Amino acid sequence: MKKRSKSGVRCFTRWSRKGYGAFASLGKVVKIGVLSLSMSIITLNAKSASAQPDTVRLLREMEIEALQVTAERLNPTRGVVTPTAVYSRDTLGIAPQQTIEGVLRLNPAIDVRERGGKGVQADISLRGGTYDQTMVLLNGIDFTDARTGHQSHSLPVDIDIIGSIDIIEGLTGIGAYAGAVNMVTTPLRPNYMRTEISGGAYGYLYSNISGAITRNGLSVLAAGSVRRSDGYIENTDFNNSNLFTRITYTSSSAGLFDMQAGYQRRDFGSNGFYSLSFPDQFEHTETALASVKWNRSFGRFTLNANASYRKNNDRYELYRGGKGAPEGWTPNYHTTDNAGASISAAFRWAAGETSAGADYRYHHIYSNVLGDLLTHPIRVPGADAFYTHEKGRNIFNGWLSHRVRLGGTSLAGSANLAGSPYGTFPSWSLSVTQQIMEGWSADANATRSMRLPTFTDLYYTNATHIGNPDLKPEHAMTYRVGTRYHAGRFQAALSGYYRHGRDIIDYVQTETPEGMKWKSTQLTELDTYGIEMQASYRGRRILRHITVSYGGMASSKAAADHITKYALDYMKHKAAVQCGIDIGKGFAAEVTASWYCRNNTPDTAYAPYWLLDARLSWSRGVFSVYAEATNLLDTKYYDFVGLIQPPRWITAGVVLTI
């Protein structure tokens, strides 16, 4: 492999079909040129290529133009991060999942619990954690909601612009108690436009347009979509829209600038979503977000900086439109602001790479139910209501990390000191990776992490729940070991983990003068352990790909005599098979089968169930059509007790890509 370096841009010429994942570790702009061993594109003209039957396969292995790749590296950042791939557009780009939630549901480490269908509202948790214990990143930027994890996944992006999704382990400091999920947006190719229209059962309609332009170091990705349905049962209708753009600019003198901005609006009927006693619930949310990142190398030094902002407005109606509401009832209004900034520097030297940095985050909420009482209420924009409560908090993290490679062994360690209204918290992470032989490696890591109580944990009180403003942060110590094997088109991974959590926040059944209620309490220690296995094969002809995965886990809590709401309500077993078949003449089929077995508790009871999803597509040139069905077997299943999920849902659509 020949390497040239000029003005901070590294160029590689590769004579193989292998992926470019290794370049992500550089954290730089990489320019790649690829040629097939079988032939040189210099001597191949278009007419002769079209006349030979084997050239289709050969052309798939060639890149006519050099492809500029901006590495989505999270380092330098606090902690020793270890990414695990969840989704890749290259493998599952035509899978029968139209939503990000559908993709995440199949991964053995992720528990996706939906209210409604097609991604209307979803809680995402990792390895037995809760939705509040999972950090959500978009292009490496933390956009986790400080009010409630119910809103953390409200991101203005669709699956068509998602190039990859990773689980991130090893983040220290405040936020990623159980880990993080990072979604990366990338264009289909440097210059394109894509439109999609689909429709189906239950009045479903989806329209989407996206595209990208790349010129002289500048890349602009933009997308917009509308998704609506009448609902599969009464009061599960929805009307959601997304707008998103990502702009990157690379200059040898100024470095790399990476900017993103988005807006989402959602209106959805919430039949029993948060309480089965109220079938006429309704929710309206608006989310706006933006961030800018900068990266510049100066010889052995690399400087990184970013700033971000996320605003979420929420109107929750226990009685939709006030119908049947008692006198004096008003909706719940919340507006949450999350702002953050980070700066770090890395230095590469003979003993490895050393980095140091700091970040700052500010959380604030105005609400008519959450927070401390305002002296002077503030009118809710566009509503006949007032914000009567507010709360704000400042969070700091500072870290120092180092990584080194000694032959086939990679070592990394990080120390972090976090500050918040709850005091200071030291944390750390360690990671070791051993290359056993070509294509086979083993790794182990340990991380100490924490999370702050959400504003809902602290203050939410209603007819069935009681908040607790005296809650303190949760703490966790997580250990993980694993091994990976890769040979040609086959790859496999096996891992096991153990997490000890203390000061766990959970809702505990408490007797009150008004009857039994769920009170936000801090009394539980929780031990969680599990295994994950995954194997996949990418074929050349009829079999495009096949992936088999399994995840199993168990948890035990110290306060066994208390009935808790979330601690033992987890996915006990999950198995999935994903298969893609090239039928020929432009036809392709994708089938996924998955099995779920959730742990039962004294307050919940779930039956194991199978789900089968399928998609049939036909493509020619820039045009493709498809028909797909989710829950093809019409399985009756629940992510939450009593809240039935959608039955068989058939849709069909048309896609034009130019």
Predicted regions and their residues:
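Flexible loop and strand-edge segments within Gram-negative outer membrane beta-barrel domains
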Residues: S229-T236, N240, A254-N338
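Short strand-turn segments of transmembrane beta-barrel domains in outer membranes
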Residues: S164, T172, G179-I213, G224, ...
